[in-house]
Amino acid sequence: MKSGRYIGVMSGTSLDGVDVVMAVIDENMVAQQARYHHPMPQALRQQILAVCQGQSLTLSQLGQLDTRLGRLFAEAVLALLKQQGLSGEEITAIGCHGQTVWHEPQGEAPNTLQIGDNNQIAALTGITVVGDFRRRDMALGGQGAPLVPAFHHAVLMHPAERRMVLNIGGIANLSLLLPGRELRGFDTGPGNMLLDAWIWRQQGKAYDKDGAWGAGGQIVWPLLKQMLSDPYFALSAPKSTGREYFNLGWLEQQLHSFPGLPAQDVQATLTELTATTIAQQVLLSGGCDRLLVCGGGGKNQLLMTRLAAQLAGIEVTSTDKAGISGDDMEALAFAWLAWRTLSGLPGNLPSVTGARAASVIGAIYPANRSLPL
């Protein structure tokens, strides 16, 4: 087992910045030691959003975006090291998810694309990087996502309590940690993605702080009913989705039949959409004793209130109360996946992704010094 000090880097679908964590990891523990949030320049965020929403660009532009994002990830890692007074030689490896700009698990040639050049990160930090985690699972017939349920199982599984872990990033995904049952996990649908896109369009704000704007609106029930009829919500697991599907274009298509709605009412309805699609999947999966929430959506008080209202009898609380930071969950997961890759251990779960087999996942980008194998 390649135990040591690992760094995890995560830039999620919400595009609010780069989360970097450091943890000591071995077969018995994941002990977080530090965290750092690195802001994403607005121009870079807008470029990534444009790509995710299908705007055409040249191969040169895509290559430049890949390089710039890799440099940003390296800056974030170096800032964390400076904060902690550490050198790159004291880190075993970095696990970097990259920025998903396209995810297409269905069809004749399933594919997924994460950018943020890992070669840049390895060269600029002097630390071995493990990245490109999703495509091996996809090559084995899986969805390539979600990958975090394996980490949820490792750190949050309880021998008796029936738990589910809900990550609300741009997309919301659910991990079913039910004693005596096979581990399953899947994307329920939009998390913060449509909420963030709509408030950005209307007010130029990155997100609806505490859900305050949405709380002042009224739910438009006919619009909600129409949105809930989208075929994705009726799909059986394994399933995954992303910004290439649930985006402003999708929302505008939904709003076409409802001209002139107050913008605040649309926000309230989108909040209810996220709460309802999550709650439906929790209940369809048999319910649980405790729903542990992580990700930025857990800070949206309106969303949490609406979710709890639809899950009477289930304790809805943060993963912080179970000992794992809700803000850092995904970055920790990719640090842990890097440890598994360097230890020669499988990182995907066929029961979650639908892959034909479990496999070591991720590509290794050696540091300038020798590879730590």
From Swiss-Prot:
InterPro entries per the UniProt record, alphabetical: Anhydro_N_Ac-Mur_kinase, ATPase_NBD
Keyword Cell division listed: no
Record keywords: ATP-binding, Carbohydrate metabolism, Kinase, Nucleotide-binding, Transferase
EC number(s) from the headed UniProt entry: 2.7.1.170
Catalytic activity: 1,6-anhydro-N-acetyl-beta-muramate + ATP + H2O = N-acetyl-D-muramate 6-phosphate + ADP + H(+)
Keyword Nucleotide-binding attached: yes
Gene Ontology terms, MF aspect: ATP binding; kinase activity; phosphotransferase activity, alcohol group as acceptor
Pathway(s) annotated for this protein in UniProt: Amino-sugar metabolism; 1,6-anhydro-N-acetylmuramate degradation; Cell wall biogenesis; peptidoglycan recycling
GO biological-process terms attached to the record: 1,6-anhydro-N-acetyl-beta-muramic acid catabolic process; amino sugar metabolic process; peptidoglycan turnover
Amino-acid positions noted as binding ATP in the UniProt annotation, renumbered to this chain: G12, T13, S14, L15, D16, G17, V18, D19
Enzyme class per UniProt: transferase
Similarity remark: Belongs to the anhydro-N-acetylmuramic acid kinase family.
Primary role: Catalyzes the specific phosphorylation of 1,6-anhydro-N-acetylmuramic acid (anhMurNAc) with the simultaneous cleavage of the 1,6-anhydro ring, generating MurNAc-6-P. Is required for the utilization of anhMurNAc either imported from the medium or derived from its own cell wall murein, and thus plays a role in cell wall recycling.
HAMAP family, per the entry: AnhMurNAc_kinase (MF_01270)
PANTHER family referenced in this protein's UniProt entry, alphabetically: ANHYDRO-N-ACETYLMURAMIC ACID KINASE
Full protein name: Anhydro-N-acetylmuramic acid kinase
Taxonomic path: Bacteria, Pseudomonadati, Pseudomonadota, Gammaproteobacteria, Enterobacterales
